[in-house]
């Protein structure tokens, strides 16, 4: 079994100024290939601590992936740390230096002298070309172990991982098969209760993860071959699908917006948002069938979109009645076959309150959610609640009634 560790380098990561999306990407990539990730570490731009971290990782892992610290400045120290740990001296590689100078020449600029360190190599390192940046990576074999050093910008790291690193990695001795089921409308603890002892098994394993769009359930199995891993996971996967059938909206790379589009069955969708700042439109932007939208908190504009003055005066915008009227208004005033509305408040006494409603020819529904949080969280949760309501209603049409809970 190939064991891996990830070291993310950068004081800005350590201080929380930048989110470490690289480690999340690499973790998913390793899992998909049956490589076991044991640890993820964040280290600042300090040569001593980087060297110590590398020594520790090499003592317990077969593959160490270092992200960041390959820039041209004095605080980019990944190359120096690897060289120190392996007791090798970096030297300028003529081919890398010529490549770097060519990049700057193509831009009509001379190469700054500080960039020369990006042409360094040690004897045990192979340079990894960077097609979208100036920092080559390193692929190092030492004592039966592998060190991979990649630049920090995600666009560079991800492309180099796929094009340069994966072809060089040894194949794992076991194959992994995994499927992630996406659910909505049920909490993580409720899922755990329903699944019972299934979550205690090691192979196949069943794990739950809370996400913005609901709760994910991952079923994974490992075996000597891909076919054996799939066969091992199949009965457990079927059981989980059966238990959670009423809440599952998709699998693996599916999106909730995409699932809603499927339930539309070719019908057009119109959206009215009041208070959510276009969060719902952002989720739907690339979906076919998304016809039109109105995003506003202006009362006069909302009245032209279907909100009645009576409702505005009696219960206000953030109300079940307003959501229902605006969902119907999305059909009437935006010309859509299905109308979806979200009304929410991100501040004041009603902060965190949201009503979402759907109106279609043969289906209407409304739901109420109350999730306190910062304004961005409130907007995102309201938008997801609207999509969840649309999916449930359009998949299994139900009579309209009082507001439920999304």
Swiss-Prot record:
Domain of life: Bacteria
One protein family per Pfam: CinA
InterPro entries in UniProt: CinA, CinA-like_C, CinA_C, CinA_KH, Competence-induced_CinA, MoaB/Mog-like_dom_sf, MoaB/Mog_dom
Family: Belongs to the CinA family.
HAMAP family: CinA_B
Stated name of the protein: CinA-like protein
Provenance organism: Deinococcus geothermalis (strain DSM 11300 / CIP 105573 / AG-3a)
